[in-house]
Amino acid sequence: MNRLPLVAAQPGIWMAEQLSSLPNAWSVAHYTELKGNIDAPLLAKAIVEGMRQADTLRMRFVQENGEVWQWVDDAMSLPEPSVVRAESHDVAMALMAADLNQNLRVDSGQPLAFHQLIQVGEGHWYWYQRYHHLVVDGFSFPAITRQIAAIYRAWQNGEPTPASPFTPFVEVVEEYQRYRD
């Protein structure tokens, strides 16, 4: 295990979550509306591959003697998202709200990354994504979405999996520490 310190906004997020009584204050989520013929099993596999490429989504956190550490758990498996059918937009929104309104603190035991494909009609889908803010930021969240979409398109066309655009997190930490020094 390569223990890494919290960097950039992470210490503030960690501390704010410790001080907050809210069970989900540091969860970030959105859904993307998809229309047309979606190969849901293929998209589900592309989601797993895209998440695998972003090592921060396999991050674990521990607090020891007042210090917080994180590490990439290479053995962590990322499950395929569930594929569900909802009778309407309102039912789909209720499914997403139910996920987002549970205890999603970093120590809750809930996954720090969660995806769901919700079919709301023929050729009409919502792709729901939820992350803990310790593992994504405003740049990486849409970057992960774009990479998953690129993987899905490539696989639909029989092309190889696109290379990961993500810098390994250990290199991000090293660069951050050089900048701070």
List each model region and its residues.
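Short acidic-hydrophobic, aromatic-tinged amphipathic segments that line or gate anion-handling sites
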Residues: 84-86
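Short, charged/polar, Gly/Pro-enriched secondary-structure boundary elements
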Residues: 74-82
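Acyl-group handoff/entry surfaces in thioester-processing enzymes
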Residues: 2-72, 89-180
